[in-house]
Amino acid sequence: MKSKIILLDSIRSMQNVWAIFRNSDWAWFEKVILTGTTPTPPRNDISKTALWSETFIDWEYYSDPFEIIEKLKKDWYKIYSVELDKRSIDYTELFHKNEEKICLVMWNEVAWVNQKILDLSDEIIVIPMRWKKESLNVSVAAWIVMYAC
């Protein structure tokens, strides 16, 4: 079985973070890594959103996302950042990849991803949009890409 983790960098909304914990359980992601200003468990006021999945999904917190990304790369994880970028590949291409170790990177919707994170990424993933908006809610985007993994 693949080793799948997701890294959330400075995501502001607790509801989105806890929704991603719930998505992680559904999509067989074994760990959620929280970095920067992302809120961390335990939070009884919001645990219902995740159906308490934060109690059994492993999670770690790092103040610096680069520290853990570099560690994951040394451990042979492929880093996939989700971002609209000239180097982006369509998320559906993930269905055809057979990587054993993957880490999805999601970030604050307003501040966008840090360029250094993009530079450390093995692939940059995009979810094509049909109309005028160029972004999705972070928990929705995470769910779509997690499904493709």
Residue ranges and their predicted role:
Residues 1-149:
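Post-transcriptional modification and biogenesis factors for structured RNAs
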